Amino acid sequence: MSTDCAGNSTCPVNSTEEDPPVGMEGHANLKLLFTVLSAVMVGLVMFSFGCSVESQKLWLHLRRPWGIAVGLLSQFGLMPLTAYLLAIGFGLKPFQAIAVLMMGSCPGGTISNVLTFWVDGDMDLSISMTTCSTVAALGMMPLCLYIYTRSWTLTQNLVIPYQSIGITLVSLVVPVASGVYVNYRWPKQATVILKVGAILGGMLLLVVAVTGMVLAKGWNTDVTLLVISCIFPLVGHVTGFLLAFLTHQSWQRCRTISIETGAQNIQLCIAMLQLSFSAEYLVQLLNFALAYGLFQVLHGLLIVAAYQAYKRRQKSKCRRQHPDCPDVCYEKQPRETSAFLDKGDEAAVTLGPVQPEQHHRAAELTSHIPSCE
């Protein structure tokens, strides 16, 4: 794929065509094994996480989709804009810049659901966002690419992998719907399945990280793309959290939207790269996609570790304040809700204070209040 930037002031200053590095050989069997194994594990993980979803809560998110709307705005508003600014700021070559834009325009991936579970996020919102962003990608991916690539004259059309999007959507909806049904019919068994799914999710993260490092070994890596693949997910997490906070979402939803924003669907991006670029450019761009996937897993694990450390610190603080209270006396974390929801929506919803900043503070503190009198 070649790109003509002559006479275009918005194109990066060092946008010159040169041969990319060659050589991604000897990994065909490993990639096939990784594809099959990850597909099976993703299906099982999504089924188990579906066991944590209650149909009433899911319907509440769909009926009043404030959290979903904020998440989609982060996914298809902030991420493509961030990708464009990174491409311009680092002066990427045209084919590299377009690959970064492709990554920024992709919907959320399954990894986000695993990380959301480990940070006590809103699983109903997480699964709703992943599904809705995948559906929205049918129109938003070409729209975002059209808006941000207008400054370059492309001699080859970009191809949107609609078939891959459809397969992704089916692989999300079918296991999750099955899990929701199991949770409705057999709630006790669903709890056990959910615990198993959390373990499988951890194994999935480990497989992705190890495979990414193995596939990247020996590649002729572009340092600039590696730097972008490292900071891009972090920028997504931070901007997603800030947008959720500014729209008065609860802390639980802020964590969820932050994770969903930074964690992209790597498989979908790889499919789009393979359909849009010739082999001479594909090696370097696949390297970027795999590096992004590796870094988003590492960043996610750091976020989980930081949250769990904070959670243990709060629990120890409560133990010191209430030494006679046993460990099991902590109340189950209440369902945090958006400040936009009305009181009449559902009686079981935990309502926050009137002021938005108080809403955030109270929603977080109530998850650590012991139930002992």
From Swiss-Prot:
Its main location: membrane. Pfam families: SBF. Residues 1-21 are annotated as: Disordered. This is Sodium-dependent organic anion transporter. It comes from Mus musculus (Mouse). Transports sulfoconjugated steroid hormones from the extracellular compartment into the cytosol in a sodium-dependent manner without hydrolysis. Steroid sulfate hormones are commonly considered to be biologically inactive metabolites, that may be activated by steroid sulfatases into free steroids. May play an important role by delivering sulfoconjugated steroids to specific target cells in reproductive organs. May play a role transporting the estriol precursor 16alpha-hydroxydehydroepiandrosterone 3-sulfate (16a-OH-DHEAS) at the fetal blood vessel endothelium. The chain crosses the membrane at residues 33-53, 68-88, 98-118, 127-147, 158-178, 196-216, 225-245, 266-283, 285-305. Glycosylated.
